[in-house]
């Protein structure tokens, strides 16, 4: 029997298929052998890759340094040496070290507290310099409102030190701040005393009340009342004119002079130097609530208290309280109510508040943007009572107060609806106590006003590009800044500060 003939073409295809099968089989065998080897070889390769990556990061840092305290992070308690330095100084980690248990990580020492906290010891370092224009802009310290409009920038200012600060100190040159209304209204001494006693990170400033220095001072600072100097200032002048207001627009001066003021210092968050009545700062912004060992409602038999002496406030707070009284017990102490508690025995009054009452009316005398005073921070949050607030907008309390630490009247359509919710809280200890979980997660810090003024005055980059309030009066008391009614339907005012630069 004759064998069938196979063409050369078929031989080629058969050979190709056999070769592919052999290659596939060899690949499978090699993979099995690789798996049986010690993991040490792969670990060494991983370490080599990590070392190469670390070397690349170090090279990048040398070419483009990372930002330091010139742009501090929002968490004050974690303001530690910059990431770039950590990358250089930390020893190489093995794969086993990277797989360290979570329990071991939790045993690491806590981050060092920044200097403005109680017992805080960490002070900022001078900012780094950048030769590249884009890098300078990207890492510029966010000290002014246009650089960070969604923050009060207080922490940024507290942690700012100019890059050439050592040269400034060695030169002996000081920034002169002229208090045009005199030293008395500020209760300070001339010279550097206020900066040195506060241990400011930047203390190369001096105070004076000598108006003869009006043409040469680095800053002219007005308190509550603007007075024209009569000196014509060159257009390229780096001198700063700053106006300080403590009270709300209803009780402050009208300033109708255009382009007379380029910095402001008020309780408003869009001021150049924000000067709040109090400043709450978390130790760690990731930890804003924690369980409490205290039942804040225990043995409290009374509902709502209010200490008040001004019965004619223009926001209608007294009328609101009287309406609230129709639906829940409200004890009004002082000239506007039937209960008495003298200011001379304030401590005793607050003991009554702590021991007997569950709620406190922290009502401001005016409904103005960002206007939150000691009525809330001191009289309420420092006590063991839940504050009900009226004054600033709901969003202002959200960014200024500890999370879930109060109730805003504008969360409810009427005093009756508010009273219904207060009754729910009165009968639910767990829900009531949930409003106190913020306690222990941070503290009210000293904002060191003079330290921040001095530090910001050393930001030469921004002094070369001055900004002016074209209409300070409109910025301070324009539409949407204050209201005599509820905030629920208000319209935000336009931004009126001029911007001549192209940042």
Swiss-Prot record:
SUPFAM superfamilies: UDP-Glycosyltransferase/glycogen phosphorylase (SSF53756). Pfam families: Glyco_tran_10_N, Glyco_transf_10. The chain crosses the membrane at residues 11-28. Keywords: Glycoprotein, Glycosyltransferase, Golgi apparatus, Membrane, Signal-anchor, Transferase, Transmembrane, Transmembrane helix. It is an enzyme of class 2 (transferase). Residues 44-71 are annotated as: Disordered. One of its GO terms (molecular function) is alpha-(1->3)-fucosyltransferase activity. It is found in: Golgi apparatus, Golgi stack membrane. The keyword Disulfide bond does not apply. Residues 1-10 are cytoplasmic. This is Glycoprotein 3-alpha-L-fucosyltransferase A. It comes from Drosophila melanogaster (Fruit fly). Its EC number is 2.4.1.214.
């Amino acid at each position: 029997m004759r064998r069938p003939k196979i063409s050369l073409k078929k031989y080629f295809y058969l050979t190709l298929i056999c070769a592919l099968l052999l290659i596939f089989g060899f690949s499978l065998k090699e993979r099995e052998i690789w798996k049986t080897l010690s993991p040490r070889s792969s670990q060494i390769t991983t370490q080599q890759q990590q070392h190469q990556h670390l070397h690349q990061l170090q090279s990048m840092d040398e070419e483009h340094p990372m930002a330091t305290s010139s742009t501090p992070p929002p968490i004050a308690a974690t303001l530690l040496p910059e990431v770039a330095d950590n990358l250089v100084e930390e020893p190489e980690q093995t794969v086993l070290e990277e797989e360290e248990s979570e329990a071991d990580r939790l045993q690491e020492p806590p981050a060092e507290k920044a200097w403005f906290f109680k017992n805080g010891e960490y002070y900022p370092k001078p900012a780094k310099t950048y030769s590249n224009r884009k890098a300078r802009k990207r890492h510029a310290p966010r000290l002014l409102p246009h650089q960070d409009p969604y923050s009060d920038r207080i922490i940024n200012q507290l942690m700012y030190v100019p890059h050439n600060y050592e040269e400034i100190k060695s030169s002996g040159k000081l920034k002169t701040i002229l208090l045009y209304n005199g030293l008395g209204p500020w209760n300070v001494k001339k010279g550097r005393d206020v900066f040195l006693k506060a241990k400011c990170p930047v203390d190369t400033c001096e105070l004076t009340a000598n108006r003869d220095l009006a043409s040469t001072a680095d800053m002219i600072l007005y308190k509550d009342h603007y007075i024209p100097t009569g000196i014509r200032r060159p257009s390229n002048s780096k001198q700063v004119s700053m106006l300080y207001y403590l009270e709300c627009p209803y009780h402050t001066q009208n300033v109708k002079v255009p382009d007379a003021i380029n910095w402001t210092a008020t309780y408003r968050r869009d001021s150049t130097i924000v000067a709040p009545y109090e400043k709450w700062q978390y130790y760690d912004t990731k930890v804003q609530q924690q369980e409490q060992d205290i039942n804040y409602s225990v043995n409290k038999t009374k509902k709502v208290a209010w200490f008040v002496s001004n019965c004619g406030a223009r926001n209608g707070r007294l009328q609101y309280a009287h309406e609230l009284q129709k639906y829940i017990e409200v004890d009004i102490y002082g000239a506007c109510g039937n209960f008495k508690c003298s200011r001379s025995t304030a401590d005793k009054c607050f003991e009554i508040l702590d021991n007997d009452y569950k709620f406190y009316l922290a009502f401001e005398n005016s409904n103005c943007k960002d206007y939150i005073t000691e009525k809330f921070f001191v009289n309420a949050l420092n006590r063991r009572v839940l504050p009900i607030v009226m004054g600033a907008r709901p969003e202002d309390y959200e960014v200024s107060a500890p999370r879930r630490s109060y109730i805003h009247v504008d969360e409810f359509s009427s005093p009756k609806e508010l009273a219904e919710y207060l009754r729910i809280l009165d009968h639910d200890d767990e829900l009531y106590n949930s409003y106190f979980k913020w306690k222990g997660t941070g503290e009210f810090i000293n904002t060191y006003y003079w330290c921040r003024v001095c530090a910001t005055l050393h930001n030469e980059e921004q002094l070369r590009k001055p900004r002016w309030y074209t209409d300070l009066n409109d910025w301070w008391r324009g539409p949407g800044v204050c209201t005599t009614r509820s905030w629920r339907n208000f319209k935000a005012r336009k931004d009126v500060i001029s911007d001549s630069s192209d940042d």
